[in-house]
């Protein structure tokens, strides 16, 4: 069908496999994104404050994602965390200041914001998007 691929794993060969399979089936492959950064980024002017709000939601999200994993499969969503501190240490879920987000963007080629992850308060999600648009994106556009 030539639909886009947003892979759930960071294995670099997935893009090649996808394109070859599209060709084999007679379809021109769509664009592909192979993620390279955390699976969730929230931008905050006070990460500790927002971790207190996001932590329980993110931990529940990680538990659901873990329950869907099957033996032998790899996924960026795979987490062994059972506490918020463990989740923070893993780095798959991150709450960053605008400057920390800019720095992260210089190291990875994909950024997954996912503002309403697992039922995050829409007002909190909107604040993150406003910080991204107002403080992160302008710095990325000038670099």
Predicted regions and their residues:
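Residue-level detector of alpha-helix boundaries and kinks
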Residues: 3, 35, 86-89, 117, ...
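Glycine-rich, proline-tolerant flexible connector loops at the mouths of alpha/beta enzymes
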Residues: 9, 113-125
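A structural signal for isolated positions on well-ordered beta-strands in alpha/beta enzyme cores
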Residues: 4-6, 36, 112
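C-terminal helical cap(s) of enzyme catalytic domains, especially alpha/beta-barrels
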Residues: 15-21, 121-141
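Glycine-enriched alpha-helix->loop->beta-strand junction motifs that scaffold or abut catalytic
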Residues: 1-6, 107
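An alpha-helical appendage that flanks or caps ligand/catalytic pockets
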Residues: 11-110, 141-143
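Residue-level preference for alpha-helix termini and adjacent loops
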Residues: 58, 92, 116-119, 130
């Amino acid at each position: 069908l030539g639909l886009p691929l947003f892979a759930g794993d960071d294995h670099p060969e997935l893009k090649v496999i996808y394109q070859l399979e599209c060709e084999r089936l007679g379809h021109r492959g769509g664009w592909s994104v192979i993620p390279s950064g955390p699976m969730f980024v929230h931008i905050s002017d006070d990460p500790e404050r927002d971790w207190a709000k996001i932590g329980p939601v993110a931990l529940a999200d990680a538990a659901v994602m873990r329950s869907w994993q099957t033996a032998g499969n790899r996924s960026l969503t795979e987490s062994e965390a059972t506490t918020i501190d463990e989740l923070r240490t893993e780095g798959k879920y991150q709450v960053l200041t605008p400057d920390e987000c800019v720095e992260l963007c210089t190291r990875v080629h994909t950024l997954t914001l996912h503002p309403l992850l697992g039922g995050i308060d829409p007002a909190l999600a909107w604040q993150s998007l406003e910080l991204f648009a107002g403080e992160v994106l302008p710095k990325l556009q000038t670099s």
